[in-house]
C-alpha cells in the first residue's frame, strides 16, 4: 500500500491496532469510517455508503456521521454488539504541520458505556469478567458509569449452574472470560451463550495469570497487599478482577479514579435465588412482555432518584439472611411510615436530586459538562433540608444516614461562583464562567461587547455615508464580518469597499476599518473561549478531588430513597411490618399477592392464610381446578417472604417469617428448544437442582410436578419427590397437583398437609372462590374450565361422555399405608432399594401396557410391526 495518501496511511496505522472495533476517524466536524467498517456501519445505521480517493486504484468505501450527533449512532452500533474505537484529532488543526495528529481516545463496548443518554437510569450497566479454574470460578464486575465494583468466587459444591445463577442476578451487558477447561470441554461457555444474549468476549489468558492480575489490582488501588480489600491470597476473584482492570485500561485509556472501592462478597451471605426462580416470580420484569410494569420491582419502585432505583433493584435481586440487618431496615420503614408530612417533604427534595453516582463517574472521566456541574450544585442545595428532616427521626439507621450525607458546601460554593446558571452544554463554546470569578475573563468579555457596539455604530455610519438604507454588517465563521449590499444598490457602493463574495441577490464587501474592528473582536472572543475552557477544567479537577465524598452521599441518598419507597408503598396499600426471626416457621395471616392485588381491584382480592414449619406442616399439597388460583397463592407466599427479607412491609394482616436461605420454584411448562430440551427434561433438570440443593431453611414452590410425561410416570415421580423432600430435606414446600391420589399421603408421611382452593358449583357452572382451606378435593373441573375458555359445545359434550366412561372404569391407585412406607424406607439403606414401593407401582406399568395394546390399530399393523410390538411387550413384562 505504498501509494496510499498520507491521511489514509495514518488511518491504516491506527486501524491495525483495533482490528475488532469500528474505527470512528475524526475529520473536521465528522467521524468517517472506511473500507469494511464503512460497509458495516452503512448497513447497520442505514446511512449512505460513498467513496473517497485514497491513493489506490479504487476509491475507499466511506460513510460518516456528524460528530455532534455521533452519540445516537454509536448507541445503535454498541447495542448490536459492536465495539467502537473513537479516534480524535489530538492537536490544533491550525498549528499542525502536515497531517494532523490523531489517536484513539476510547473504545466503547456494551459494558463500558458512560454516556447517560445511552443508559437506563434505574439499572446498572455491568461489565463482568469470569475466570474458570479447575478449583472453581472467580467473578468480578463493574459499572464504570457509577464506579460500583464487586468480586466473588465459587469454590464449594462447584457446578456451572451456580455460575449461571450469579450471572442471572447481575445480568452484565458484556462478559470477558477465560475458562481453563474450555478447550477440553466447552460446555460452560456454550451454556452461557445459549442462556444469555449479552456480548461475550474470550479474553487473553495471560491477563488472568496470578501475578499479572494481582499487580493490576495493586496498581489501581495503590496498595501493597489485597487483604485490606477483602481478598484472601488464593481468592479466584483476584484473577477475574485483574483481567477486568487490564481491559478497562486498554479500552478507556485513562485513570478511573471513581472506581475507588471493591466489594468482595460471598455468594452465601445473601438469599440464593436461581435464574428460574427470578424468572418465575417476575422479580424485575414480567415473563411475557419483559417489562418492569407487572413485576415486583414495578410495584415497589416509588423511588425519586436514579441511585435509589438502582439500589432497590439490587435489594430485590439479593435479599438478606441476617435478621439484625433486616430488622434495622424494617424499623426505619416503620418510622418513615409514621411521618406523613416528613415523607412528603423528602419526596419533594429527593425528586430534585441529580444522578450523583453517574455524575461522579463523568467527573472522573473528564466528560462532565457545564450543565452537569449546575445540576450537581442544584442537587447539593437540597441536602441541608434532607439532613434537617432526618435529624427529627430517632433511629440508628437515620443517625447513620445523617452522618453519611455530606452537603459538600465548598463544592456548592465553587460551582455557584464559577459557572453560569444557563451555561451551554459544551465546555468549548464559551459562555460558561460567571462574571466576577476571573478578572481577565471579565476584561475580555467587555472588549468583545464593546467590539459589537463598534460594529453597530459602524453599520449606522456606513448607511449614512453610502446612502444605502438596507446596508447590513453580518458575520459567519468562514468570512468573518462583512458588509452586505443588495443587487439593486450596487451602483451606490463606495469605491473604498473591497468585494469579498458575489451571491445571486447580493454582494459582500469589507473595509480596512471593519477588518481592524473584527481583529479586536475575534481576538477577544477566541481568548475568552479558550480561557473559559481552561477555567472550567480547573473547576472540574477541584471537584474531582471530592469524588469519594460525592459517592458516599449518593449511596446514603439512594438508601434513604429506597426506605422512603417502602414506607410510601406500605402506607398506600396497607402493608404491615413482618416479624423476622430465626425459627423454622412461616406464618402469614390474610396474605395477598403484592402485584395481582394492585393490578386488579383491591377489594375483590381474596386473602389467604399460610402456616409452614419443618416438622408438622412442611409439605402442603394443594389441589383445585385450573384457574382457581393455586399458582397465584404459591407465588404470593414466596413474594411475601422475599419482601420481608429485603426489609419491606408485606401485604398481610400479620406475618412472622423465619429466615429463608433459598427460594426454589418449579413452575410452568416450557420447552428449552435452544438447548434441545423437552418440557419434561427441563422440568426434571430443575427438580434435580432443587432436590440436590434445598435445605431445611429453604422455601420450595412446586407446581404440577410430573405433568410433562405420562400419567403413571408423572404420579410416580411426584410421589417420590414428596417422600424424598420429607425424609431428607424437610424444606418448607408448597406442592400443587392434579394427582389427587397424592392427597392420601397426609397422615402417612409426617409433615404432609392437604389444602384445596374452594370452588362453588351452580348447576353446570363453577365459581372460583380463591380461598385456600384445609383438606383435599377429588374433582378437577377441567371440562368446566374448558367451557370458560370457549371450547366448542360439541367438543365439551364429547369430553363429558368420555369422562363419564373413564370414571366407570377407573381403578383406584393404592397409596400404601404409613407402616408400608416406613418399612420401605427402612429397607432402602444406603443402596436406596425401593422394592417396598415398587410392589405398588407395578400396577402402573401393567396399566400402561394394557393401554398400549388397547390403542393398537390392528388393521393398519403390518406383520413385521406386530412382531416388533410383541417383542417389546414381552421385554417390558419380563422386567416387572
Swiss-Prot record:
Which SMART domains does this entry report, sorted A to Z? MUTSac, MUTSd
Its Gene Ontology cellular component terms are: cytosol
Q: Does the keyword DNA repair apply?
A: yes
At which positions is ATP bound? 624-631
Gene3D superfamilies named in the record: 1.10.1420.10, DNA repair protein MutS, domain I (3.40.1170.10), MutS, connector domain (3.30.420.110), P-loop containing nucleotide triphosphate hydrolases (3.40.50.300)
GO MF terms held by the record: ATP binding; ATP-dependent DNA damage sensor activity; damaged DNA binding; mismatched DNA binding
Could you confirm whether the keyword DNA damage appears in this record?
Answer: yes
Function of the protein: This protein is involved in the repair of mismatches in DNA. It is possible that it carries out the mismatch recognition step. This protein has a weak ATPase activity.
Q: PANTHER family given for it?
A: DNA MISMATCH REPAIR PROTEIN MSH1, MITOCHONDRIAL (PTHR11361:SF34), DNA MISMATCH REPAIR PROTEIN MUTS FAMILY MEMBER (PTHR11361)
Q: What is this protein called?
A: DNA mismatch repair protein MutS
Species of origin reads: Alkaliphilus metalliredigens (strain QYMF)
Question: What high-level taxonomic lineage is stated for the organism?
Answer: Bacteria, Bacillati, Bacillota, Clostridia, Peptostreptococcales
